[in-house]
C-alpha cells in the first residue's frame, strides 16, 4: 500500500476530468469513446456527490432502459481523483449493455468488464500526475477482493459444482448461497484475468475479450465460466496481484 505521504488525492475540474476520460477512451477503445461521447452530448452522465436514495453506499450507477436501448450513468465524483475511477467503471457497464444489445438480465459476470476497465484506466493514470491515486485505487480494489475471498472462503470452495438460478446459486450438495458472493468473486477474477492478458499478452487478450463480448447476454453463466476456466481465472488473479507489488516496488 502507498504510504500516505506519497499518495496525493489530486483535485481536478470537471472539464479536465472529462478530457482525461476522453483521452483514455481514444487510446483504449474508440468504440467505447463513441458511446461515451454520445452519453455526454445527450446529457446522460451526471456527476454529483449526493447519495442515492435507497443506495447509500453506492458510488456509481448505470441504468439500462432495454426497450429504448439507452443507458444513463451516475457517478459520485467529487473532483478528487480517489473518486475518478467511478465513471470509467460505470462506462464499462454502458459498453457491456451496448455490446449485448441492451440485455438487462442478471448475469454473474456483470462486474467483470467494469473491473477490468478500472485496472486499465489506472495503468493510464500511472503515466500522469495522478499516478499516486492510480496506485491507491488499485490497492483498494485488490485489498477488498482478497478480504472478501478470505471472508467467503467456505462459499468459494463450493463454486466448483455450482448451478445458477438468480438470485441464488445451488451447489452439488444442495446447499444454497447468495449469488452476490459468486458475482463479486468471479467478476473480480475474470476482470483481473483480462487485465493480466491486456498487459502482457495482447494477442490472447484480443481473442478472449472478443469471446467474452460474444457470449455475454447470449449464453449461460455456466458456459462462460466453463470457457474461461477457474484455473485461468485464478492464475490471472494471482499474477495481477503480484504485478501490483512489483510495479510499486520499482
Language-model segments: what does each one mean?
Residues 1-72:
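Contiguous, non-catalytic segments that form substrate-binding/exosite surfaces or channel walls
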Residues 20-31, 90, 94, 120, ...:
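Generic, well-ordered alpha-helical scaffold segments in large soluble proteins
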Residues 133-171:
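Amphipathic alpha-helical blocks and their helix-capping loop/short-beta junctions
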Residues 121, 161-250:
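C-terminal, non-catalytic "cap/extension" segments appended to globular domains
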Residues 68-87, 101-105:
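Short pre-active-site segment immediately N-terminal to the catalytic Zn-binding motif
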Residues 81-86, 104-112, 177-185:
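Short, conserved micro-motifs enriched in small and acidic residues
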Residues 86-90, 94, 98, 112:
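Catalytic glutamate of the conserved HExxH
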Residues 100, 104-149, 187, 228:
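Post-HExxH zinc-binding segment in Zn-dependent metallohydrolases
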Amino acid at each position: 500500500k502507498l504510504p500516505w505521504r506519497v499518495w496525493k488525492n489530486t483535485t481536478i475540474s470537471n472539464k479536465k476530468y472529462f478530457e482525461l476520460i476522453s483521452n483514455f477512451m481514444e487510446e483504449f477503445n474508440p468504440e467505447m469513446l463513441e458511446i461515451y461521447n454520445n452519453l455526454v452530448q445527450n446529457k446522460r452522465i451526471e456527476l454529483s456527490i449526493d447519495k442515492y436514495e435507497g443506495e447509500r453506499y453506492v458510488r456509481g450507477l448505470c441504468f439500462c432502459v432495454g426497450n429504448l436501448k439507452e443507458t444513463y450513468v451516475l457517478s459520485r465524483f467529487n473532483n478528487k481523483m480517489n473518486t475518478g475511477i467511478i465513471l470509467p467503471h460505470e462506462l464499462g457497464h454502458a459498453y457491456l449493455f451496448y455490446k449485448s444489445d441492451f440485455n438487462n438480465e442478471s448475469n454473474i459476470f456483470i462486474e467483470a468488464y467494469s473491473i477490468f476497465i478500472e485496472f486499465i484506466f489506472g495503468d493510464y493514470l500511472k503515466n500522469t500526475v495522478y499516478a499516486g491515486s492510480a496506485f491507491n485505487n488499485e490497492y483498494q480494489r485488490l485489498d477488498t477482493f482478497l478480504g472478501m475471498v478470505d471472508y467467503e472462503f467456505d462459499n468459494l470452495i463450493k463454486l466448483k459444482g455450482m448451478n445458477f438460478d438468480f438470485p441464488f446459486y445451488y451447489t452439488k450438495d444442495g446447499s444454497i448461497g447468495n449469488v452476490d458472493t459468486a458475482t463479486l468473486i468471479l467478476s473480480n477474477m475474470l476482470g483481473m484475468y483480462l487485465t493480466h492478458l491486456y498487459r502482457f499478452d495482447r494477442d490472447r487478450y484480443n481473442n478472449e475479450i472478443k469471446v467474452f463480448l460474444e457470449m455475454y447476454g447470449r449464453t449461460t453463466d455456466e458456459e462462460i465460466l466453463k470457457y474461461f476456466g477457474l484455473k485461468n481465472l485464478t492464475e490471472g488473479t494471482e499474477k495481477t496481484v503480484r504485478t501490483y507489488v512489483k510495479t510499486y516496488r520499482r
